């Protein structure tokens, strides 16, 4: 498996849906076998994943939204690599 890069374009895998879940009071990733509760950082990243934007564009959007945060690029790359390993997303 190749390394995740800023040029990759992530998208949720078929059957997965990202949404706010009032009963859980957090964003979740729903899929046929269950649900993953997401922390705020994971939700901010997955909220940018639309199948059209590159990881570089996602990083830029998050830097604009959270200018005080350091290490956004590394955090995004690390999280999306984990998401890919868990088969939540595909990279193109």
From Swiss-Prot:
In what pathway does it function?
A: Cofactor biosynthesis; pyrroloquinoline quinone biosynthesis
- What keyword terms does UniProt attach to this protein? PQQ biosynthesis
Statement: the UniProt record of this protein carries the keyword tRNA processing:
no
Is the Ubl conjugation keyword given for this protein? no
What Gene3D superfamilies does UniProt report for this protein, alphabetically?
Coenzyme PQQ synthesis protein D (PqqD) (1.10.10.1150)
Q: Which GO terms describe its molecular function?
A: quinone binding
What are the recorded Gene Ontology BP terms? Answer: pyrroloquinoline quinone biosynthetic process
Pfam families in the cross-refs: PqqD
Function comment: Functions as a PqqA binding protein and presents PqqA to PqqE, in the pyrroloquinoline quinone (PQQ) biosynthetic pathway.
Q: How does it assemble?
A: Monomer. Interacts with PqqE.
Q: Give the similarity note.
A: Belongs to the PqqD family.
Q: What is this protein called?
A: PqqA binding protein
Annotated gene: pqqD
């Amino acid at each position: 498996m190749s390394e995740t890069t800023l040029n990759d374009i992530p998208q949720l895998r078929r059957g997965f849906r990202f949404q706010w879940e009032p009963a859980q009071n957090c964003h979740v990733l729903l899929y046929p076998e269950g649900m993953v509760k997401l922390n705020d950082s994971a939700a901010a990243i997955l909220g940018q994943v639309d199948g059209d934007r590159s990881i570089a564009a996602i990083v830029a959007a998050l830097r604009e939204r959270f200018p005080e945060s350091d290490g956004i690029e590394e955090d995004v790359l690390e999280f999306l690599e984990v998401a890919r390993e868990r088969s939540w997303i595909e990279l193109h």
